[in-house]
Regions:
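C-terminal substrate-binding subdomain of Rossmann-fold SDR/epimerase-dehydratase oxidoreductases
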Residues: 1, 26, 32, 212, ...
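N-terminal Rossmann-like NAD(P)+-binding domain of SDR-like oxidoreductases, especially those catalyzing
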Residues: 1-183
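Short, surface-exposed alpha-helical segments at coil->helix boundaries
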Residues: 48-51, 164, 202, 261, ...
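CheY-like receiver
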Residues: 76-77, 117, 207, 235, ...
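Active-site proximal helix/loop that lines the substrate pocket
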Residues: 89-95, 132-135, 185-191, 221, ...
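Short, solvent-exposed loop/turn segments at secondary-structure boundaries
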Residues: 98-99, 140-141, 155, 191-196, ...
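Short-chain dehydrogenase/reductase
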Residues: 104, 153-161, 195-202, 226, ...
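NAD(P)-dependent short-chain dehydrogenase/reductase
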Residues: 141, 168-224, 229-234, 238, ...
């Protein structure tokens, strides 16, 4: 299937959480395609936002330093937008278990605020909401798909599951034009590479860039999809361009299935520094590990003609080239 070039020129686009990893890369691409981009971001350090992420486009976009938990503020910014990408999220699995109320506020109440604002003030806008593969929990069949039941194992994943349902309920009850795109282990430029609180493979990249040990529990045999950021961004944009995806849930993941040990070793190889060490599982950690997590992308390929363009090796090379000149910007 031929994929048409997205039509974003002069479109008014709002990106909540636009200073974070996925949101900022989305902002760069939308600006490149001629859109009028507004970023709405509180810059909460727990969510991985970084003002340096918009270096190079800051003069061509608008940034509103506001909180999605403030209904009046988010309402003001949804009113005239053609497309809204909801990337605002507290993204740490571990933090969600330590501070569940914070995760509940951002990942559930924040989404309700956004949906209510859209319903009241701009019901014709196009909404793309980001979900996550961890909503599924331990997989009952593989490759899993959008019909797999959800058994989340942490508060973050549970709230992402609930917020996805909020989006679908509002779409069906109020005819909002929303789509959920679930992502899995996205890596690349502009990520939070300094902390294990965020995606494990981006943390691996940060360790390798500092020539440190990458620690893998057990033998690291658990299989994962890893998706380069440009592929994730292209999926999000394509999902906003057609009514075929309205009220749908789509997995946008890579075709590659690699073990955690393989991901660690390839990271060291392509970054050119660091080393991989294997240690016994910490007490209690193995009990919450979900094992293999292989996801199918057949639905999004069929509906949108989307397909990943970057393998992990190419993605790691591009990631290294991005971080090396500006590494200090990503380590607080």
């Amino acid at each position: 299937m031929r994929v048409a070039k997205p039509e974003l020129k002069n479109k008014k686009i709002l990106i909540t959480g636009g200073l974070g990893f996925i949101g900022s890369n989305l902002a760069h691409k939308c600006a490149e395609l001629g859109a009028q981009v507004t970023i709405f971001d509180y810059l909460d350090p727990r969510s991985g936002g970084n003002i340096y992420n918009v270096e190079g486009i800051r003069d061509s976009i608008k940034i509103a330093f506001h909180d999605i938990l403030n209904f009046d503020q988010i309402s003001e910014f949804v009113t005239d937008k053609d497309i809204i990408f909801n990337c605002a999220s507290s993204t740490s699995h571990a933090l969600s278990m330590r501070e569940p109320w914070i995760d509940l506020d951002i990942n559930s109440k924040g989404v309700i605020n956004l949906l209510e604002a859209i319903r009241r003030f701009n019901p014709q806008t196009r909404l793309v909401h980001i979900g996550t593969s961890t909503q599924l929990g331990k997989l009952r069949y593989q490759p899993s798909d959008e019909n797999h039941p959800e058994f989340p194992r942490d508060i973050y994943s549970a709230n992402k599951s609930v917020s996805e349902k909020y989006v679908l309920i509002y779409c069906r009850a109020y005819n909002l034009r929303g789509t959920v795109v679930r992502l899995s282990n996205v890596f690349g430029p502009r990520a939070s590479i300094h902390s294990p609180e965020f995606t494990f493979n981006n943390f691996f990249i940060g360790l390798a860039l500092q020539n440190k040990n990458i620690t893998v529990f057990g033998q690291g045999t658990q299989m994962r999809n890893v998706t380069y950021i440009d592929d994730a961004v292209s999926a999000l944009i394509l999902a906003s361009q057609t009514d075929k995806t309205e009220s749908e849930v789509l997995f946008a993941v890579s075709d590659e299935h690699l073990s955690i040990a393989e991901i660690a070793k390839l990271t060291v190889e392509h970054i050119g520094s660091g080393r991989v060490t294997f240690v016994d599982w910490p007490l209690g950690r193995k009990n919450i590990d979900i094992g293999d997590a292989i996801i199918s992308n057949k639905k999004i390929k069929k509906l949108l003609g989307w397909a990943p363009q970057f393998d992990i090796r190419t993605g790691l090379d591009l990631t290294k080239n991005y971080y090396q000149p500006c590494l200090e910007k990503y380590f607080p």
